[in-house]
């Protein structure tokens, strides 16, 4: 759907909403919108969102944070895929071994770029909140055993899976939390189980 007679800024906001939601699986916060389109005032963003809602391009639930729905995306055909929820991770055992799978979870296929080699881990704790990953979220992970600096990965440390941002530097691996209250984990080596490709959050 094309926005007619809109300011450039409003078009930028709408395009960012679509891009962010397709990439992350959930809508951006108002502050994230501000940063993306170089606006300092959250009230200005709220004004643009209100006008987009009046045009029927988005729907917002004022009682819930981030509860914003893009009508164009909602009207797309939502093919569902089953992704295994991994309840535990054991060293030396394939991540998708039957005994590791706790349940299956269906999500619209447009929440992820592909449906190959995916699994879900339930997020516990607040060590990644500044990356928008909250306690109770379902982290959608693509199985990979390698990572690039800056990737958010699932790493196996002492038989326990942890979600952190990956950096390899000076012969060591730094697993960096996204919460200033937590210290990074520095190790010589670790097993990379996968890379974060999406977050699913129930409101």
UniProtKB/Swiss-Prot annotation:
SUPFAM superfamilies per the UniProt record, alphabetical: LexA/Signal peptidase, Winged helix' DNA-binding domain
TM region(s), chain numbering: none
HAMAP family listed in its UniProt record: LexA (MF_00015)
Site (Cleavage): 91-92
Biological classification of the source: Bacteria, Bacillati, Bacillota, Clostridia, Eubacteriales
InterPro entries: ArsR-like_HTH (IPR011991), LexA (IPR006200), LexA-like (IPR039418), LexA/Signal_pep-like_sf (IPR036286), LexA_DNA-bd_dom (IPR006199), LexA_repressor (IPR050077), Peptidase_S24_LexA (IPR006197), Peptidase_S24_S26A/B/C (IPR015927)
Gene Ontology annotations of biological process type: DNA repair; DNA replication; negative regulation of DNA-templated transcription; proteolysis; SOS response
Keyword match Nucleotidyltransferase: no
Family note: Belongs to the peptidase S24 family.
Keywords, alphabetical: Autocatalytic cleavage, DNA damage, DNA repair, DNA replication, DNA-binding, Hydrolase, Repressor, SOS response, Transcription, Transcription regulation
DNA-binding interval(s): 30-50
Coiled coil, from the record: none
This protein's name: LexA repressor
Catalytic activity, reaction form: Hydrolysis of Ala-|-Gly bond in repressor LexA
Assembly with partners or alone: Homodimer.
Active-site feature positions: 127, 164
GO molecular function: DNA binding; serine-type endopeptidase activity
Function: Represses a number of genes involved in the response to DNA damage (SOS response), including recA and lexA. In the presence of single-stranded DNA, RecA interacts with LexA causing an autocatalytic cleavage which disrupts the DNA-binding part of LexA, leading to derepression of the SOS regulon and eventually DNA repair.
E.C. designation(s): 3.4.21.88
Iron-sulfur as UniProt keyword: no
NCBIfam families per the UniProt record, alphabetical: lexA
Gene3D superfamilies given in the database record: Umud Fragment, subunit A, Winged helix-like DNA-binding domain superfamily/Winged helix DNA-binding domain
């Amino acid at each position: 759907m094309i926005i007619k007679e809109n300011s450039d800024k409003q078009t930028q906001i709408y395009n960012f909403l679509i891009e962010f939601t397709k990439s992350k699986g959930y809508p951006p916060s108002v502050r994230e919108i501000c940063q993306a389109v170089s606006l300092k005032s959250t009230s200005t963003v709220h004004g643009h969102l209100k006008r987009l809602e009046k045009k029927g391009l988005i729907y917002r639930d004022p009682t819930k944070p981030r509860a914003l729905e893009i009508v164009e995306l909602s009207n797309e055909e939502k093919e569902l895929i089953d992704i295994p929820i991994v309840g535990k991770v054991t060293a030396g055992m394939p991540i998708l071994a039957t005994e590791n799978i706790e349940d299956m979870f269906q999500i619209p296929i447009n929440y992820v770029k592909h449906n190959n080699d995916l699994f879900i881990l339930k997020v516990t704790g607040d060590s990644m909140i500044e990356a928008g990953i909250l306690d109770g979220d379902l982290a959608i992970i693509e199985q990979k055993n390698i990572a690039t600096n800056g990737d958010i990965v699932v790493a196996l440390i002492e038989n326990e899976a942890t979600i952190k941002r990956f950096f390899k530097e000076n012969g060591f691996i730094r697993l960096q939390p996204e919460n200033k209250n937590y210290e990074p984990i520095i190790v010589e080596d670790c097993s990379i189980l996968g890379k974060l490709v999406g977050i699913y959050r129930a409101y």
